[in-house]
Amino acid sequence: MFFLYTDFFLSLVAVPAAAPVCQPKSATNGQPPAPAPTPTPRLSISSRATVVARMEGTSQGGLQTVMKWKTVVAIFVVVVVYLVTGGLVFRALEQPFESSQKNTIALEKAEFLRDHVCVSPQELETLIQHALDADNAGVSPIGNSSNNSSHWDLGSAFFFAGTVITTIGYGNIAPSTEGGKIFCILYAIFGIPLFGFLLAGIGDQLGTIFGKSIARVEKVFRKKQVSQTKIRVISTILFILAGCIVFVTIPAVIFKYIEGWTALESIYFVVVTLTTVGFGDFVAGGNAGINYREWYKPLVWFWILVGLAYFAAVLSMIGDWLRVLSKKTKEEVGEIKAHAAEWKANVTAEFRETRRRLSVEIHDKLQRAATIRSMERRRLGLDQRAHSLDMLSPEKRSVFAALDTGRFKASSQESINNRPNNLRLKGPEQLNKHGQGASEDNIINKFGSTSRLTKRKNKDLKKTLPEDVQKIYKTFRNYSLDEEKKEEETEKMCNSDNSSTAMLTDCIQQHAELENGMIPTDTKDREPENNSLLEDRN
């Protein structure tokens, strides 16, 4: 609560603090203002500096970061869970003691009424109510209340005013009159920000003192070549230990000796006070049975002032460290994301490069395979063509040789390459080996297949023959008119005997050869042999 008031009212005075940055002399001479000297790094950053930085950032461009709603909701959920956890723990620890106290007071009242028959229960309740009212008014009902001790003497009133402006509010004493309550309201409104200024100044001075001390420690460790992180950790530990010794341990020992508390109760009071919680169950100088010195309560308030400044410096330092840590964490996360994106890009590029290389290699292999296959097809076509030419008569071979010397070679080779599947013939060596043990019927069938192949080839050749070759072909055609008559006779013979497959094949072969310009000279030589074969078959 107190630190919220401090931040709010410090923001009101933060604007005038930024005014000395301007230098009138340099401004009038037309020169840019000299840069302000960079302050030495300090361990603690006061609330005033933080507020000034926020004001300057807002005035320069409105770049002040705003917490997102998701973050606010997440923090709210964490706080609620923290509160529920604390409530469960406190209930488990304190509720049994409260129940035992209720049973104890009920038994005490019953025993008192039984021992004192003249006192009615109503009179006892009235007495207890008066005791509670006196305690709430700051008067202890224990002992003789007619002594000279008072909760509103100068020392006690000064201590109460200190608890108001420090927002501790122990609650052991409070104003009971209407005038006192009204004055307390106004006094708190103007006193809390005033004390905030004082607290900020003391925090700056404490931060400067401890910063110089820590700088000396850092110099000592730098000579020993210790890393910067270790130096800061050691400096922080030393700062916290020194503050705990000065503002927690020593006051706890003093309170234990003066107030008669245990060590736990003394430390409990110190921490509750310096954190401005102030439950009021333990208050320094609140025991009516102890005769305190006049300077005791003002000294306690001065300790509260310096201790609050120390705790404010520590909390501010922790907040700054959390901001720096959050910023570094964001930067590290950004770097991790950048590295991840770079790694992903590299992996993608390598994958693409590998895929490209594989595709190129596969394409090259396919090209090589296609080239080898094409070469094999060409070689097979040439072998088959040579085999077909070997089966022709010498006159036809001479004609094809004359055609090969011209432009027919490329056209015939292209025709063979375009139709490799139609040239499924065996090589000459295999044909010779197979022909040695084959029957006459197989020989006739082979000649028939050769004639069909020759017919197909000559159909393609006709389409690609140039004009000069066509003239040679026509001349050769006129020269073989006598042979055409023999073809007609052979066709008549084929028509008369349709049941003979071999003769039909021979007729088709002769017809195809004559039709394509091939004149088999050995036809007459084979006629007697074919006739004898047909007679034997019939």
From Swiss-Prot:
GO cellular component, one term: monoatomic ion channel complex
Spans within the Cytoplasmic topological domain: 1-71, 203-233, 320-538
Keyword Lipid biosynthesis: no
Pfam family, one: Ion_trans_2
Record key words, sorted: Cell membrane, Disulfide bond, Glycoprotein, Ion channel, Ion transport, Membrane, Potassium, Potassium channel, Potassium transport, Transmembrane, Transmembrane helix, Transport, Voltage-gated channel
Polar residues: compositionally biased ranges: 412-421
Annotated K(+) 3 binding sites: G169, Y170, G278, F279
Outcome reported for the amino acid change (mutating L315W): Reduces norfluoxetine inhibition
Consequence of substituting A174P: Loss of channel gating by extracellular pH
Catalyzed reaction equations: K(+)(in) = K(+)(out); Rb(+)(in) = Rb(+)(out); Cs(+)(in) = Cs(+)(out)
Amino-acid positions noted as binding K(+) 4 in the UniProt annotation, renumbered to this chain: T167, T276
Chief subcellular location: membrane
Substitution effect: F210A: Reduces channel gating by mechanical membrane stretch
Residues bearing carbohydrate: N144, N147, N148
GO BP term (any one): cellular response to arachidonate
Site (pH sensor): H151
InterPro entries: 2pore_dom_K_chnl, 2pore_dom_K_chnl_TREK, K_chnl_dom
Membrane topology according to the record: Multi-pass membrane protein
Region annotation (Selectivity filter 1) ranges: 167-172
Ranges for region Selectivity filter 2: 276-281
Subunit structure, interactors included: Homodimer; disulfide-linked. Forms heterodimers with other 2-pore domain K(+) channel subunits, such as KCNK2, KCNK4 and KCNK18.
Family: Belongs to the two pore domain potassium channel (TC 1.A.1.8) family.
Record-given protein name: Potassium channel subfamily K member 10
Organism for this UniProt entry: Homo sapiens (Human)
